[in-house]
C-alpha cells in the first residue's frame, strides 16, 4: 500500500509541476529570450512555411489572426474581422518549383497517403480554437524567424514562407515568385 501511495503522490507532483511550467517553445535554439514569448525560432536563414489551403473560402471556423497560403490565387492571406486580407500583393505567385519547372509542389504536397485532419499543435492552455499551430497564451507572442534580407539569403524559399527581415525591419512573405514586405 505504501508503494501505491508513493506512486500516486509522485504522479500528482509531476502533474502539478507540468501544469505550472510556462508553455514556451524554442525551435533551432536552446531557449526563448524571455517569459513573454510562446514560440521563437533560431537565427538561421530559414522561414516558417504557412499551411497551404485550396481556397480561403473553404476554410471553416477560421478566427482572426489565422494566416495561410491560398492555392487558388497563390497568395499569403490573413483573416481579420471583415474577411481575408492579401499580404502578397502580387499576381505572379506560383507553386512551380523554380529549380525544376516540371514539378508542381502542390502535386508533391497532395501525394500523401494518410493525412490526419485533426492534427494540431497547441502552445499554452488549450481551447477549441481551430488551426494547425495555435498559440493559446493571452500574454505571450511568437517571434518569427529573423533573417537579414531574406530575398537574398534564403535559397529556394517555399511558397507561403514568412519571416521578419532584420535589415529593413519588416514582415516578409513569399508567394512562390516574389517577396512582399510589410511594415507596421
Residue ranges and their predicted role:
Residues 10-18:
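Bacterial N-terminal signal peptides
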Residues 19-23:
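Sec/Tat signal peptide C-region and signal peptidase I cleavage site
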Residues 2-7, 24-184:
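C-terminal trimerization/auto-chaperone modules of long, extracellular attachment fibers and adhesins
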Amino acid at each position: 500500500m505504501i508503494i501505491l501511495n508513493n506512486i500516486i503522490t509522485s504522479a500528482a507532483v509531476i502533474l502539478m509541476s507540468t501544469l505550472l511550467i510556462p508553455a514556451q517553445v524554442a525551435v533551432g535554439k536552446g531557449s526563448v529570450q524571455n517569459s513573454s514569448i510562446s514560440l521563437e525560432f533560431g537565427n538561421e536563414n530559414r522561414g516558417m512555411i504557412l499551411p497551404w489551403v485550396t481556397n480561403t473560402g473553404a476554410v471553416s471556423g477560421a478566427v482572426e489572426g489565422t494566416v495561410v497560403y491560398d492555392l487558388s490565387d497563390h497568395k499569403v492571406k490573413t483573416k481579420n474581422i471583415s474577411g481575408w486580407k492579401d499580404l502578397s500583393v502580387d499576381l505572379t505567385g506560383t507553386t512551380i518549383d523554380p529549380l525544376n519547372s516540371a514539378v508542381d509542389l502542390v502535386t508533391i504536397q497532395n501525394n500523401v497517403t494518410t493525412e490526419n485532419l485533426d492534427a494540431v499543435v497547441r502552445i499554452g492552455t488549450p481551447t477549441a480554437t481551430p488551426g494547425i499551430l495555435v498559440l493559446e497564451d493571452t500574454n505571450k507572442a511568437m517571434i518569427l524567424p529573423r533573417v537579414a534580407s531574406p530575398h537574398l539569403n534564403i535559397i529556394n524559399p517555399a511558397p507561403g514562407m514568412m519571416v521578419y527581415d532584420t535589415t529593413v525591419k519588416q514582415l516578409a512573405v513569399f508567394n512562390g515568385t516574389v517577396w512582399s514586405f510589410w511594415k507596421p
